[in-house]
Amino acid sequence: MNPTPLESRFDTYAAYRQAVADTVMLARRELVVFDPDLRETGLESPAMEQALRAFLSAGRDNRVRIVVHRPDEVERACPRLMAVQRLHGHGLSFRQSPEDLRHLSDCFLLADGRHAVIRFHADHARGKLLIEQPDEVSGWRRRFEDLWGLSVPAIASTTLGL
């Protein structure tokens, strides 16, 4: 059963992180994320680590794709997320945005092409949550696919050594 369509606004980081958590819990097949460094998403919390592990374990075709501007910052600041990637490297992929697009300052997380959390600017908490809004989410999805195609692989799931 699909959730009731909803559009709501938020203007605090706590409300933003709750919207991210709610959207992750709605995901059944795919999560896509565009964020400069994931710092404010809450994806690094213990609850989100558990939710992402459960999501990726729920189906072998489930995927999380993330585009960031600063993957080195993500590696350093997100050990829980890195642990999820080590365990589920097949399902969790990172890419780095090209240098000429690092001025992009909005952030978004999309689930299954139907649900979205959108922050209008990375420096501010203000944004909106879209539940069961595939028509509005489709433009954000196209934007993500364009970014994904222009970005380069980053943050390997394994460490190579001698």
Predicted regions and their residues:
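Interdomain hinge/linker segments and adjacent boundary elements that couple functional modules
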Residues: 1-39
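Signature of lipid phosphatidyltransferase scaffolds
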Residues: 10, 120-162
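Terminal leader/tail segments of proteins
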Residues: 14, 54-55, 63-64, 145, ...
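Amphipathic coiled-coil/heptad-repeat helices and related helical stalk/stem segments
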Residues: 16-17, 48, 77, 140
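Primarily the HKD phosphodiesterase
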Residues: 23-88
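HKD (HxKxxxxD) catalytic microenvironment of the phospholipase D
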Residues: 31, 93-140
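Long, hydrophobic, amphipathic alpha-helical segments used as structural scaffolds
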Residues: 35, 63, 68, 92, ...
